[in-house]
Amino acid sequence: MSDLQTQMKQAVAEAAVAQIRDGMVVGLGSGSTAALMIEGLGARLAAGQLRDIVGVTTSFQGEVLAAELGIPLRALNATDRIDLAIDGADEVDPSFQLIKGGGACHVQEKLVADRAERFIVVVDSTKLVRCLNLDFLLPVEVLPGAWVQVQSRLKSMGGVAELRMATRKAGPVVTDQGNLVLDVRFENGISDPIALERDINNLPGVLENGLFVNLADEVLVGEIKDGVAGVRSLDRVG
């Protein structure tokens, strides 16, 4: 990651933390930008600038980081509300539709985003695209005994799906739910994310896919202007 990209991520993470208020239950996302947000939240709590905050994490890594920083946590099943969820994205299109799941935790991320009263997406400017899936693969979480069948069905839908392999262990990536991940590319990208999310999730053996449709309320973008990192709230198109 370049120094400029790090500056963009830091700026947008700080802007998101600034929207957290005392007494909130906050969904804590996953990924590099979300990690900076969690660190910023922990620092504000430690300094007494925020209080009575409860976090709901979306990944094991986020849970460990938040606990190390002293952020009180609550399980999703024990939560009757989430006031605000903050998470990153791998791609964002002009209509605020997203691809997430580069870290293979999109199931929990989607559950938290869906529960939240307000969902803020934090990205740097490199994550903005005109069409989803032209560059970033679409993750699909599948039952271990169904990945070949799902791979075949995705092919019939025009997608090329490959089993995601681990880099620090032999064999495939295994999700927090004990499932596998197929990474899918559609040749011309995804023209109708809403329909495709539904169609993929209707395939037997699929738990969830990484299309987040009609969930984001605001997209904060970190960008560099005149050599200085800043943040803007993206205007939704369509």
Curated annotation (Swiss-Prot):
Segments forming a coiled coil: none
EC number: 5.3.1.6
Pathway where this protein functions: Carbohydrate degradation; pentose phosphate pathway; D-ribose 5-phosphate from D-ribulose 5-phosphate (non-oxidative stage): step 1/1
Catalysed reactions, semicolon-separated: aldehydo-D-ribose 5-phosphate = D-ribulose 5-phosphate
UniProt-listed Gene3D superfamilies: 3.30.70.260, 3.40.50.1360
Active site: 109
Keyword Manganese annotated: no
Gene Ontology molecular-function annotations: ribose-5-phosphate isomerase activity
Keywords of the record: Isomerase
Residues annotated to bind substrate: 30-33, 87-90, 100-103, 127
BP GO terms, sorted: D-ribose metabolic process; pentose-phosphate shunt, non-oxidative branch
GO cellular component: cytosol
Pfam families from the UniProt entry: Rib_5-P_isom_A
Family: Belongs to the ribose 5-phosphate isomerase family.
Function as written in the Swiss-Prot or TrEMBL entry: Catalyzes the reversible conversion of ribose-5-phosphate to ribulose 5-phosphate.
Subunit note: Homodimer.
Name of the protein described by the UniProt record: Ribose-5-phosphate isomerase A
